[in-house]
């Protein structure tokens, strides 16, 4: 009976979970660009997410228009991606380490931007685009509606951009860097640009979340990469067989973030210890990442293995290794 009573409170919490899922979904789209398109493990996300929130709040507190504040936050995120990209391409630092270095530096930068660990902003005094206060209202300024529109614009712009020559060059760089260089594509430039675009989206998500919750915190991006990966993996697991278009794949990532937050809300409603949420998230991501490997190693059909063995045998007959005498 206690479980049923708790579940009865779930519908009232779903609008907030959906709104948060949509906001984090924009960040997850940024993670998708580096993780799937560029094939780069970018850990800048944990820092650039907080940078977007910090810059947006401080711009609003200084009297700036909300749209201008969002633009400045996006540019700040773009700059963080540029730094990571240059550390990787110009200085030769491995991508994962370059992201860690930028993330570490951004902690101090975010503290400097805000002047302290957190800054709050009142929806009654400032014209915010979205707010937690409006999440249950049936109006145009409802955060769910506003973020759906923002997500649609983001997906539309990315779909157009990755259809251009420059966007196709970024996709080719992630797919096969050696072949891209052979075709005259500047892979270093594409990596830097891809990281910049990705972190610009992450910062946009951070800016929207800071408005939604009414404050920016220096640690608000901690664990963001795990949430982003969870959204990407859940979206692919649920929709990969039916969503083949690039725009639909991006939409599936956003839906994956919504599913993630609904599950989190369900778990919290059932009385799960909130202190263990990060452990749960990490475990879910680890399992979903391991599933493709387990499928190939333990659950592949014998017919497929026989075909692979036959192909290897055929190749060895067609291209025999030179004997020791021939050498």
Spans of features found by a protein language model:
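Helix-loop-helix "hairpin" substructures at the membrane interface of multi-pass membrane proteins
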Residues: 80, 140-225
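Transmembrane helix-bundle core of multi-pass membrane transporters
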Residues: 95, 99, 103-163, 193, ...
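Alpha-helical transmembrane segments within multi-pass membrane transporters and channels
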Residues: 64-104, 109, 149-153, 255-256, ...
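Membrane-embedded helix boundary and interhelical linker motif in transport proteins
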Residues: 35-90, 136-140, 242, 269
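Transmembrane alpha-helical segments in multi-pass inner-membrane proteins
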Residues: 202, 206-278
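Membrane-interfacial amphipathic/re-entrant helices at transmembrane-helix boundaries
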Residues: 1-27, 55, 63-68, 140-141, ...
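Cytosolic-side transmembrane-helix boundaries in multi-pass membrane proteins
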Residues: 175-182, 186-189, 248-251, 263-327
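Short loop segments and helix-boundary regions at transmembrane helix junctions
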Residues: 36-41, 82-125, 214-218, 230-251
């Amino acid at each position: 009976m206690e479980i049923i009573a708790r579940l009865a409170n779930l519908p009232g919490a779903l609008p907030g979970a959906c709104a948060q899922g949509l906001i984090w979904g924009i960040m997850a789209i940024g993670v998708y660009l580096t993780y799937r398109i560029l094939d780069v493990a970018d850990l800048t996300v944990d820092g650039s997410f907080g940078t977007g929130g910090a810059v947006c709040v401080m711009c609003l507190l200084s009297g700036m228009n909300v749209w201008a504040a969002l633009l400045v936050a996006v540019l700040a995120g773009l700059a963080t991606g540029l730094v990571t990209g240059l550390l990787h391409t110009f200085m030769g630092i491995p991508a994962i380490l370059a992201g860690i270095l930028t993330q570490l530096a951004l902690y101090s930068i975010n503290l400097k931007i805000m002047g302290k660990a957190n800054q709050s902003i009142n929806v009654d005094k400032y014209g915010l685009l979205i707010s937690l206060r409006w999440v249950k209202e049936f109006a145009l300024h409802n955060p769910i509606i506003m973020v759906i529109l923002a997500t649609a614009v983001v997906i539309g712009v990315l779909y157009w951009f990755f259809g251009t020559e420059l966007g196709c060059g970024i996709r080719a760089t992630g797919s096969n860097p050696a072949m891209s260089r052979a075709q005259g594509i500047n892979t270093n430039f594409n990596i830097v640009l891809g990281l910049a675009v990705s972190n610009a989206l992450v910062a946009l998500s951070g800016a929207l979340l800071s408005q939604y919750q009414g404050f920016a915190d220096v640690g608000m991006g901690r664990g963001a990469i795990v949430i982003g990966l969870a959204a990407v993996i859940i979206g692919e697991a649920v929709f990969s067989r039916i969503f083949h278009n690039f725009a639909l794949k991006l939409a599936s990532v956003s839906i994956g973030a919504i599913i993630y937050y609904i599950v989190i809300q369900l778990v919290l409603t059932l009385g799960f210890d909130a202190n263990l949420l990060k452990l749960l998230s990490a475990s879910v991501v680890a399992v979903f990442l391991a599933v493709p490997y387990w499928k190939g190693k333990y659950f592949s059909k014998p017919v497929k293995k026989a075909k692979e063995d036959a192909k290897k045998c055929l190749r060895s007959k067609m291209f025999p290794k030179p004997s020791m005498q021939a050498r």
